[in-house]
Amino acid sequence: MATKTLKVTQTKSGIGRLPKHRATLTGLGLRRIGHTVELEDTPSVRGMINKVYYMVSVEG
């Protein structure tokens, strides 16, 4: 059975944001605006996305 995945794209810069939010972007594997990563749909990943929802867009 295949695991569900989410496509997360960074839409805004991490410059001038809270250090914890910048660290969360790094934890998600995002490096720059427009960068997209595919991540497993787990509660921990969902929590990280919820923390920086205003800087990312999610598909899937």
Swiss-Prot record:
Keywords attached to this entry: Ribonucleoprotein, Ribosomal protein
One term of GO molecular function: structural constituent of ribosome
GO biological process: translation
One Pfam match: Ribosomal_L30
Gene Ontology cellular-component annotations: cytosolic large ribosomal subunit
PROSITE patterns with a match to the protein in the record: RIBOSOMAL_L30 (PS00634)
Superkingdom as given in the UniProt entry: Bacteria
InterPro entries for this protein: Ribo_uL30_ferredoxin-like_sf (IPR036919), Ribosomal_uL30_bac-type (IPR005996), Ribosomal_uL30_CS (IPR018038), Ribosomal_uL30_ferredoxin-like (IPR016082)
NCBIfam families named among the record's database cross-references: rpmD_bact
Family according to the record: Belongs to the universal ribosomal protein uL30 family.
PANTHER family per the UniProt record, alphabetical: LARGE RIBOSOMAL SUBUNIT PROTEIN UL30M, MITOCHONDRIAL RIBOSOMAL PROTEIN L30
Subunit structure of this chain's protein: Part of the 50S ribosomal subunit.
Descriptive protein name: Large ribosomal subunit protein uL30
